[in-house]
């Protein structure tokens, strides 16, 4: 495939040796900057995170958004270098500048290690589910029509709460594209991302990472389902309505553009669904089970801080790949290019997010975040550009301050009506606003890459953001007006 050829070229001509050089240059520059900037401590003796340290994160976002326009060829060959360089700047600065003690390490070391562990878990889940789903072939017999497509996306929104937004996206994207071969437009995929890859997963901790982190911290497992389902129904229902209108318009336009088409091709086919890949289905169940390994180890064996669940998921993904029927891989047009692109880009994103999240954690309460409306829009705005899971935790910390986020503080928060309103604002905003950009939630970028390697010309970073502003944001404002304010 074209994308594979690109990444293969990167690997051999601009591979790990050049990536390492880019990382080392970034580390050196970050360490050099740390030597010129005096460090300050707050009243608690912790380092003050300067706002300018967010610059590498902004730079990597601008690179993702603009470089494909400046030179698509340079970007495809060198995007890992951008990621490693900017990630290296942040890492070098933290390791040299922040030498105070924290959790048995220096403050800088702890934050870098914590970010890398989160990155490892992210890659294990997102890329692991992609590999596993490549060995599952779902065939939907019929022709893509507005009603059928809308029903499929509605099913995906429900499924996301059982296998996660990433799992639902990876399972349904390929059959969705095959069902609509010849009539699929970029907006079809954009709405798939909004509905299946994000907003659909707002009902259970399995659905989306922010809710899972809330569950680990003490939010009851069924709390989201029992309290957020009206918001889920409103947002998902309106997005499905938009999808149906858009797809109906495309259907009429497509029919008008092919007036001489064979009537047989326009006649509805008998509907049917078949699923192949029993090994992949077993591995999918194991991948979801892997999500619960770390909390179980913490609860019953008092073991924490070791990403055992992520390691288990990677082993399951490897087994799924080697045991899969190659015929199913070929039918799914399986390629490792999406895994490579997401894995390499998010390496830099996770590292450069460290100061952004640190600044938010230290200054959130001073930024006027003290009511449900402020929590909703602040959590949402940052979830669109930062990873929505740590953003959720940071605002949850602000909500329970000065207590730490734990089962006791969560119970106290939920015992008050104002506390429940804050949690609703934080939780729904983190999930829903994650759909506003390609990097707001794990599966977004993966879906975009799969679609592009299949020949669909997806919107740019800013193009997608523009569509989110005119489609998604009005719906989320309506959600605020009805349920949050």
Predicted regions and their residues:
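Intrinsically disordered, low-complexity non-transmembrane regions of multi-pass membrane transporters
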Residues: 1-39, 43-53, 57, 88-89, ...
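Juxtamembrane and boundary regions of transmembrane helices in multi-pass small-molecule transporters
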Residues: 18-22, 26-41, 203, 213, ...
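Transmembrane alpha-helix boundary signature
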Residues: 33-43, 69-73, 91-119, 130-147, ...
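Flexible hinge motifs at transmembrane-helix junctions and intramembrane kinks/re-entrant loops
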Residues: 48, 63-82, 114, 140-144, ...
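Hydrophobic mid-bilayer segments of alpha-helices in multi-pass membrane transport proteins
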Residues: 52-64, 78-94, 119-129, 276-286, ...
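Membrane-interfacial helix-loop connectors
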Residues: 91-95, 160, 171-184, 188-190, ...
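Alpha-helical transmembrane segments
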Residues: 114-126, 223-242, 301-315, 377-384, ...
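Transmembrane helical segments that form the transport core of multi-pass membrane transport proteins
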Residues: 284-402
């Amino acid at each position: 495939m074209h994308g594979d050829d690109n990444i293969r070229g990167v690997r051999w001509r601009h591979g790990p040796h050049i990536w390492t050089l880019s990382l080392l240059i970034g580390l050196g520059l970050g360490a050099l900057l740390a030597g010129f900037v005096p460090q300050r401590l707050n009243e608690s003796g912790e380092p003050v995170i300067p706002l300018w340290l967010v610059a590498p994160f902004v730079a990597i976002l601008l690179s993702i958004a603009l470089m494909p326009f400046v030179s698509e060829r340079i970007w495809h060959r060198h995007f890992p270098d951008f990621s490693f360089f900017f990630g290296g700047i942040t890492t070098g600065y933290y390791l040299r500048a922040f030498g105070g003690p924290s959790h048995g390490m220096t403050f800088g070391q702890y934050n870098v290690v914590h970010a890398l562990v989160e990155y490892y878990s992210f890659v294990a889940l997102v890329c692991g589910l992609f590999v596993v789903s490549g060995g599952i072939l779902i065939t939907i017999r019929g022709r893509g029509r507005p009603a059928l497509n809308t029903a499929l996306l509605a099913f995906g929104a429900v499924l996301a709460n059982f296998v996660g937004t990433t799992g639902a996206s990876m399972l349904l994207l390929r059959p969705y594209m095959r069902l609509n071969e010849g009539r699929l437009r970029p907006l079809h995929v954009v709405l798939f991302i909004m509905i299946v890859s994000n907003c659909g997963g707002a009902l259970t901790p399995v659905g989306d990472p922010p809710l899972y982190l809330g569950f680990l911290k003490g939010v009851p497992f069924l709390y989201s389902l029992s309290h957020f389902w009206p918001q889920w129904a409103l947002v998902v229902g309106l997005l499905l309505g938009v999808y149906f209108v858009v797809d109906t318009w495309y259907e009429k336009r497509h029919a008008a553009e092919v007036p001489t088409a064979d009537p047989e091709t326009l006649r509805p086919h008998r509907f049917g669904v078949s699923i192949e890949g029993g090994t992949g289905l077993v591995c999918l169940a194991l991948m979801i089970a892997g999500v619960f390994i770390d909390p179980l180890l913490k609860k019953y064996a008092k073991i924490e801080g070791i990403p055992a669940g992520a390691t288990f998921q990677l082993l399951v993904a490897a087994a799924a790949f080697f045991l899969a029927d190659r015929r199913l891989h070929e039918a799914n047009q399986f390629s490792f290019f999406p895994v490579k692109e997401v894995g390499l880009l998010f390496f830099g994103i996770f590292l450069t997010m460290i100061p952004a999240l640190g600044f938010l954690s230290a200054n959130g309460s001073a930024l006027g975040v003290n009511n449900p409306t402020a929590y909703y829009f602040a959590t949402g705005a940052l979830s669109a550009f930062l990873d929505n899971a740590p953003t959720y935790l940071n605002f949850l910390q602000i909500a329970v301050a000065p207590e730490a986020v734990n089962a006791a503080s969560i119970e106290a928060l939920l015992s008050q009506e104002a506390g429940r309103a804050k949690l609703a604002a934080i939780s729904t905003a983190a999930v829903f606003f994650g759909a506003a950009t390609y990097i707001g939630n794990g599966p977004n970028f993966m879906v975009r890459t799969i679609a592009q390697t299949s020949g669909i010309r997806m919107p740019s970073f800013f193009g997608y953001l523009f569509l989110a502003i005119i489609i998604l944001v009005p719906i989320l404002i309506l959600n605020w007006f009805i349920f949050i304010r």
